Amino acid sequence: MKRIVELKERNYADASTHADAPVNYEDAIENYKRILDITGDITANIIAPNSEAVDIEGPHLIDNRMHYASKTLENIQATRQAGLWGVSMPRRYGGLNLPNVVFSMMSELIAAADAGFQNIWSLQSCIDTLYEFGNEEQRQKYIPRICEGEMMSMDLTEPDAGSDLQRVMLKATFDEKENCWRLNGVKRFITNGDSDIHLVLARSEEGTRDGRGLSMFIYDKRNGGVDVRHIEHKLGIHGSPTCELVYKNAKAELCGNVRMGLIKYVMALMNGARLGIAAQSVGLEQEAYNEGLAYAKDRAQFGKKIVNFPAVYDMLSRMKAKLDAGRSLLYQTARYVDIYKALEDIARDQKLTPEERQEMKKYTRLADAFTPLAKGINSEYANQTAYDSISIHGGSGFIMEYKCQRLYRDARIFSIYEGTTQLQVVAAVRYITNGTYLSIMKEMLEGELSCDCMKGLRDRVAKLVQLYEEAVEKVNASENQDVHDFLARRLYNMTADIIGSLLLIEDAAKAPELFKKSAHVFVRMAEEEVIGHTAYIKAFNPEDLEQFKAVEEENEEA
């Protein structure tokens, strides 16, 4: 953390011009703690108590405008008054200059209180993309507004362009007379779609049909030209408005350069959003575990509390182990992102030293490798934990009066939006096949542990790394791309199992009283998965694919 603060604060230069800026590392950490305390107070006393009413009411569509649920407005007002907007932005624009690690902690706290509101609040991170790729005039125009509490959205998806964003057809044409761009078309499934400032992916190049014809634009609601045609009625996250938008010759500004919208800017935007979903997942997972544990301690059957039944404490211990491992993965990823982004920011103002360039290259690679792991596996853990929380509640979990049913409904989208888990596998698979993850695992195995009590457990994980290496070699040896794609999810899960185990072992070595039990449980789970997946992969032959394709053929014959 010390390196992150050092890079973010640049020798604490802001202290001379901003009264709230830290003067040293200790001061910065105290500042982060104060902000987290404020966030925790608001989530506990306002957002969480409002969550049930928000879930019931949801947003409203009136005259082509979206209106938040009344309690959502209370949440927004509370976070505005506390200054919790634009928090990652430099102080010169009105931000708090917080690192991603702290932003992720805030996201986790808010998501535990209400995952739908976390969507609305965390979309402020879209401003990072404008800060990185917009010009200085745009930064000065828009960033202070976000820091004051205005809303953002990223308008990417269309009816015929979901995961395949290169099919986006919303049209951008340059208006020579007004010296601006005009946007026309429809966007669908836009979270917080009636926001104040939108980042919009649109087709600027006439006659193109692939990603190279797409650019990124800034739409300001103050200029008008966009209607909300529909608000989706969803399974969960009811407080988060999901909108269909109609762009009617809407005035917009180009962000960055033409043709770079998808291949560069959206990739940066999505990586930030995926880290946000990882934090959202961990927050909800914590709440689902808390609800399950509290119910198990209170509910008695057959003369004793159900928490004392092996079937129940098995579930609870697995929930806790996934939570602890997933959280460790989240914050390791956030640390990597913080270091490379801080160095990128410094490089805008001055030339980096050769050592700094190498450091940025290293942490960019690590962040790129860890982000799809953190998003994918934590979103899956959130779904599993919410499911198990309902199981612990039994029939009561199926009743709307209990919170666990809402957590279950809210969690379902986590493994879908901002790239399905299958797409996270696609993003991660090259780091599997080229040995990046394997190198990380081996480096972690060689690292010093704070406590010898975890060495035996790490030795067991070392055996899993050997199996993992054999499984990767088996897949790499195949020249059949369908085999690679078919087995990729198993390799991805194995990667998360092993890296999660090693991270949790490091945590347990530092704080055995907090993480030792979870580390033991998680390693057992990892052994169960890695050994099973390795056996499956080693026994798999290309012709086996036909057995799975046959399912579709049988349906056609029927």
Stretches with model-predicted labels:
Residues Y93, G435, G447-A558:
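C-terminal amphipathic alpha-helical interaction region
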Residues Q118-E136, G162:
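N-terminal glycine-rich flavin-associated loop
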Residues C180-V226:
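A short core secondary-structure module
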Residues K2-D41, T129-N135, V312-L330, Y336-Q358, ...:
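N-terminal leader/propeptide and maturation segments of large enzyme subunits in energy/redox metabolism
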Residues M1-F117, K141, D345-P354, F540-A558:
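Amphipathic, small/basic residue-rich leader segments at the start of a protein or domain
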Residues R222-G225, R229, P241-A273, N290-V307, ...:
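A glycine-rich, basic-preceded beta-loop-alpha segment at the flavin cofactor/substrate interface
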Residues D324-K375, V472-F486, I505-A509, E513:
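C-terminal helix-coil-helix/basic helical segment that borders enzyme active sites and/or dimer interfaces
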Residues G83, D155, I237, K361-L445, ...:
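Alpha-helix capping/hinge segments and adjacent helical runs
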